[in-house]
Amino acid sequence: MRTTDFAKHLTSFFTEYLIGERGVSPNTIRSYSESFSLLLNFLDEQVNIKADNLRLEHITRKMVLNFLDWLQDTKKSSNATRNQRLAALRSFCTYMQYEV
């Protein structure tokens, strides 16, 4: 199985950027990991995009807004939790600005 561009960049984001360059805490790694697990779950259940088919172009503003709504409506996440998930996505997108 080939690695998608999303998987490749997400792996690099965690291993090279968050741990290597930023030196974030294990709690941040855990929180960000949970955020991306939820995103993959959302995409699989709601958008019918499997993790092994996910590409960067699938990550759009509309998709992120739908994901955030899903967190609140389906997962009953608080505003604070929703914002934590958004922060993880924002950090990844900021990282991607300099990588692509």
Show which residues each predicted segment covers.
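Short, motif-level signal for alpha-helix interfacial/capping segments enriched in acidic residues
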Residues: R2-D5, L10-F14
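N-terminal core-binding DNA-recognition domain of tyrosine recombinases/integrases
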Residues: T11-N27, S33, S37-V100
